[in-house]
């Protein structure tokens, strides 16, 4: 039960952070759409897709709700969606690294008691989930983050993938 609780908490943190990083990268690269859609927030309900969240809790491999990007307004035009994805994945990787680096700080701050064991377990689970999330989201298919690549490079392919996003998501699950 404890492992499932850790994975639930890690999924909330990783999905929320990654969704926020996607929206922030899109905004910094010139697309205001995610900001207007309310995605530039740390609200997990804005970012988590139900199927992706359940898969994330069960296997530590998941995805966030797709972000609507306009490649024409992004810096880099056609490669803009790829830049947004890479920035967000780098942010998620940094989150995992930070969680891993906080373990000794927590241990020495709490003196190795049960509180530190719980928090260290949560940090380790979040770090592992973040790494697994980044690795799975490097696969260039929608609904995964790297699937945004197709929206800029080959819009017809991206449109087809977007249309069949749910069957693809269920296949990934």
Language-model segments: what does each one mean?
Residues 1-173:
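Hydrophobic transmembrane alpha-helices and their immediate loop junctions
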């Amino acid at each position: 039960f404890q492992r499932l609780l850790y994975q639930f908490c890690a999924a909330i943190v990783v999905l929320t952070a990654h969704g926020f990083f996607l929206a922030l990268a899109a905004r910094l690269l010139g697309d205001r759409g995610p900001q207007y859609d309310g995605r530039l927030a740390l609200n997990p309900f804005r970012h988590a897709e139900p199927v992706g969240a359940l898969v994330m809790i069960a296997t530590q491999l998941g995805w966030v709700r797709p972000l609507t990007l306009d490649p024409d307004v992004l810096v880099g035009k056609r490669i803009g969606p790829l830049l947004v994805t890479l920035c967000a994945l780098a942010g998620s990787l940094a989150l995992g690294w930070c969680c891993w680096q906080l373990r000794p700080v927590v241990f020495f701050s709490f003196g190795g008691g049960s509180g530190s064991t719980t928090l260290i377990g949560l940090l380790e689970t979040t770090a592992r989930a973040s790494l697994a999330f980044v690795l799975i989201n490097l696969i260039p298919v929608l609904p995964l983050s790297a699937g945004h690549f197709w929206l800029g490079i080959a819009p017809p392919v991206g449109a087809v993938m977007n249309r069949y996003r749910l069957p693809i998501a269920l296949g990934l699950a």
